[in-house]
């Protein structure tokens, strides 16, 4: 595997020089594994991307693929709502980490001209959902996008960025492939997601085994999200949060559904074994601490929606300092001010 | 995973029976849960085997439920 690895490193170093597409495609062969002696000192390697690809492939070829789709369908429809909120048409759009294409099914031909679906799992792309928009499926890792600068009018990403190792870099790449005045609409799982499961496992493992190891992956906090988007170069940021609570009969059903969604743990520091005693204890604790009146247990999914724009001259900018014509003290007389058409920003 | 996934399938089917056996042992599970929850109150400290007694009761109930279903069917 020496030659492809060498070529891949060459591609990474000449990233700024816009390497032609056929060489970039070779990245997929060694993608997902960060080089040990990497160029950037801040490169993190938390998740095993290879294992994540295997998990998503397994999840996508299950006998009943729609059984576990409910969460992604819901978030996909909410992202499509946000796309419709923007009164514009997008000739070329990209869906990063699309899974089976949950966003495309809610959009129409008038809004999106052509849709690129990118995911690391080929089984998911093969079983994609029906949509009226012409699509192109690309096997690509969210951190190593094989696209040129200033390509897309719209990039969407639904519930897949929480598995990337280097989120700042992924966001920078998204910014890079967007056209000026292009928009990125993303949804990712936030800090409070599955806190009930995390707490139950933590308590049970401490009581049963004397210590605990992380079973739920670390999520981004909402403050960090704003900073990351700003650092990646996005303009006019909007971050809002949504909480979806799903009730399950018990902890085991929740874990089975998470596995069916392809959301199993793939961090390098995961413990390989979860004892049956610990699982039993955790299920008992979960039920006792968090159950609803009807006996079911809730699981919280906190979703952060973010919208960021790539800079363009036509976009609104903050006004110059000292250019105010009205002061805040006159806010009480706003009725007199408004008919004059003299509103201060 | 092995070629036909026999071991994985067996382990998974055993795991799938856990929820119904846990449902049988509702009282013991609640007692264990309450004990652990009490340790999270301010001033409490959760250490290993803090609720060992309650957990033993839960585990023996669970094993009895498992034996019953084994004798009962499949």
Swiss-Prot record, chain A:
Keyword terms of this UniProt record: Membrane, Methyltransferase, Mitochondrion, Mitochondrion inner membrane, Oxidoreductase, Transferase, Transit peptide
Compartment(s): Mitochondrion inner membrane
Pfam families, A to Z: Methyltransf_11
Gene Ontology cellular-component terms listed: matrix side of mitochondrial inner membrane; mitochondrion
EC number of the protein: 1.-.-.-, 2.1.1.-
Biological process, per Gene Ontology: methylation; mitochondrial respiratory chain complex I assembly
UniProt-recorded Gene Ontology molecular function terms: monooxygenase activity; S-adenosylmethionine-dependent methyltransferase activity
Targeting presequence: 1-36
Entry's family note: Belongs to the methyltransferase superfamily.
Subunit structure, interactors included: Interacts with NDUFAF8, leading to stabilize NDUFAF5. Interacts with NDUFS7. Interacts with PYURF (via TRM112 domain); the interaction is direct and stabilizes NDUFAF5 protein.
Function: Arginine hydroxylase that mediates hydroxylation of 'Arg-111' of NDUFS7 and is involved in the assembly of mitochondrial NADH:ubiquinone oxidoreductase complex (complex I, MT-ND1) at early stages. May also have methyltransferase activity.
Official protein name in the record: Arginine-hydroxylase NDUFAF5, mitochondrial
Lineage: Eukaryota, Metazoa, Chordata, Craniata, Vertebrata
